[in-house]
Each structure stands twice: as C-alpha cells, then as structure tokens.
C-alpha cells in the first residue's frame, strides 16, 4: 500500500545525491526548476491580470448601469413633482391647494416637421406654413430616431420661448421613450461650449451625481437598449458663450458616427433650441426638424380641465 510513496521518497533521495555529487547536474536541475517556477508565475500573473480586468470591467459596467438607473429615477422624479413649487408661494397656508404633477398635466404639443435642405430658412414663418400640423409627437419622434437615414443625424426640435421644449425632453426620457432608450439630458446652458461632446456628457454626469462615471464607461457597458442623448438649449449655449458655435450640430453628428466606429454602438441624439438665430447653425442635409406649435384653444382647454 505504501509502495508509491516509498518509490517517490527513494527517487528524491537519489536526485538530491546526484545534485550534490555532480555540479553540472546541479546547475541543470536549477535551470529546469527555474523554468517550472517561471511558468507557474506566468500562469499565476496572467490569471491575476484576467481577474483584475474582469473586476474592472464589472465595476465599470455596474457604475454605468447605476448611473443610467439614477437618470431614470431623476427624470421620473422631475415629472412627478407638482407643476407649481408650493415652497415658493407666499400664501400663509397652502394645505388646501393641490397642484397636478407635470406628468399628469402634460399635454403633447402639436407640431410641424420637415426634412432640412440647404435652401430652407427655418426662422422664416412662411417655411412652416407649407407643413401640415401634426398631433402624434411621441410616435413621430420614435419613428424618426429608428429611421436608418435620419436616425444617424441629430433630430432638431425648435420652439418659441415657453413652448415646452424642456418639459418635452423630460417626458421623452421618463415616459414616452423610456422603454426604447437609456436617456441622458445634457443642459447646454451649464456646459463648457469649447469642450468635446464626450467631455460635455462627462461634465453633466459629474454635475448630476459626482460618481466618477464617464461616457466611455457607458459606451463600453454592453447595454440592453440603445442610448439617447438630448442636448437641451442649443440657443442658450450660443448666448452664454458669446461666440458662434454654428457647427455644433455637425459635431454631434460626428460624435454619433464615432461611437459606432469606436464602440460599435448606435447613439441617437436630439437637440432642442429656440428658433431664434437657428439659421446661423450649420445643419446637414436630410436632418429631421420639428417645430413645436404654440398652444391652441383646444390644448389650453384640455390643460385647464386637467388642472
């Protein structure tokens, strides 16, 4: 029963005796043992590198997915707050006053749409007179973003002051497009205009959550839904900077292309702006453009009824 163990013991004794008696054999055994140890170390370090890489990847993925989940909660929280901030009212008591939340009182705007061509002047009212009035803004935006051609260019949403562009952005993020996309809203008023688009996204994430998550973490995280980035307030970026960032829409289109080339992902983009000064912007041919209409009597009545 103990024969194999005894054989190994005798082999080791003879092996060590040879190493003592013959220096060449001793050198050879050291070289061979060193090779074996080095091989084990290489395998060990490779495994450590793999484990560290897997950990970093999982950590990055977790950070990205947590950030997107935080954004989902953020936009839902915003549209579920009352349309009037009671804390800013000067009444002695507001106990009996109940205001509807933004989600409940939201009335989708009617709009007009066109495909941009170089000879079109978007600020000219006559341009929009030739376009039909539509009422299906949620479906229209969803269809445009999925379109193979227009979906590779940013969708431009225009409107007069008070047309509801920012609320529409939050409704798109929290409700209308939630099941189709992970949504991030970039407030251009607060960004550094000279930065690249990824840097502006990083800046927005840092301002919102300060969690160290970067755009590259999100782009590399293998999400189950595509990403939609809404750049809200192109006109405010222009006004705040004092410079003409007329190529900004083209920068966003290039950003979309780069994400496909670098990360193999399709990123959809929406840009909102007041119609003022929009003719100074460089807009690519075939870009989809929406003009939000001011509230008509029908929508005002519907809004008041909800209130």
Feature roles, as predicted:
Residues 2-63, 94, 114-307:
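P-loop NTPase signaling cores
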Residues 63-73:
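Long, charged/polar-rich coiled-coil alpha-helical scaffolds that serve as structural arms
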Residues 74-130:
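Charged, amphipathic alpha-helical linker segments immediately N-terminal to NTP-binding catalytic cores
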């Amino acid at each position: 029963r103990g024969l194999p163990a005894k054989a190994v013991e005798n082999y080791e004794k003879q092996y060590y005796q040879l190493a003592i008696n013959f220096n060449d054999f001793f050198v050879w055994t050291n070289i061979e043992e060193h090779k074996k140890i080095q091989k084990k170390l290489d395998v060990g370090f490779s495994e450590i590198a793999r484990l560290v890489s897997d950990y970093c990847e999982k950590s990055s993925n977790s950070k990205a997915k947590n950030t997107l989940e935080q954004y989902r909660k953020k936009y839902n929280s915003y549209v579920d707050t009352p349309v009037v901030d009671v804390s800013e009212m000067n009444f002695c008591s507001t106990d009996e006053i109940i205001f509807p939340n933004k989600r409940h009182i939201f009335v989708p705007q009617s709009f007009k749409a066109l495909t941009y061509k170089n000879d079109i002047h978007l600020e000219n009212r006559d341009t929009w007179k030739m376009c039909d009035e539509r009422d299906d803004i949620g479906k229209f935006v969803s269809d445009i973003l999925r379109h193979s051609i227009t979906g590779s260019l940013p969708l431009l949403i225009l409107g007069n002051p008070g047309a509801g562009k920012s609320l529409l952005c939050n409704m798109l993020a929290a409700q209308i497009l939630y099941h189709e996309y992970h949504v991030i809203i970039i407030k251009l008023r607060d960004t550094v205009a000279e930065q690249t688009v990824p840097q502006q996204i990083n800046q927005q994430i840092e301002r919102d959550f300060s969690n160290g998550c970067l755009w590259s973490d999100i782009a590399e995280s293998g999400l189950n839904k595509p990403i939609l980035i809404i750049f809200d307030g192109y006109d405010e970026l222009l006004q705040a900077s004092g410079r003409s960032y007329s190529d900004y829409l083209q920068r966003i289109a290039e950003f979309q292309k780069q994400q496909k080339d670098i990360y193999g992902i399709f990123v959809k983009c929406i840009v909102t702006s007041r119609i003022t000064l929009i003719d100074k912007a460089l807009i690519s041919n075939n870009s989809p453009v929406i003009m939000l209409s001011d509230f008509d009597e029908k929508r005002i009545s519907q809004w008041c009824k909800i209130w």
